[in-house]
Swiss-Prot record:
This is Uncharacterized protein YBR200W-A. GO terms for cellular component: extracellular region. The lineage of its organism: Eukaryota, Fungi, Dikarya, Ascomycota, Saccharomycotina. Its main location: secreted. Keywords: Secreted, Signal. It is found in: Secreted. Residues 1-13 form the signal peptide.
């Protein structure tokens, strides 16, 4: 599934302990948290990042 949506272009910093990062080949980062009720990953924000590594 390609989750490439233009939802949020701003970066939201949250506790890394409750956060999971997943990288997609589309160049987007999906930020989700684990729900204590359903224990399912929920989408918090989806934004595109630039390749500034190195």
């Amino acid at each position: 599934m390609l989750l490439c949506f233009h939802m949020c272009q701003r970066i939201m910093w949250l506790p890394f302990d409750l956060m999971k990062w997943r990288r997609f080949h589309c160049g987007a980062v999906l930020v989700g948290t684990l729900s204590l009720r359903n224990r399912s990953p929920k989408i918090l924000s989806l934004y595109f990042i630039s390749d500034r590594t190195g």
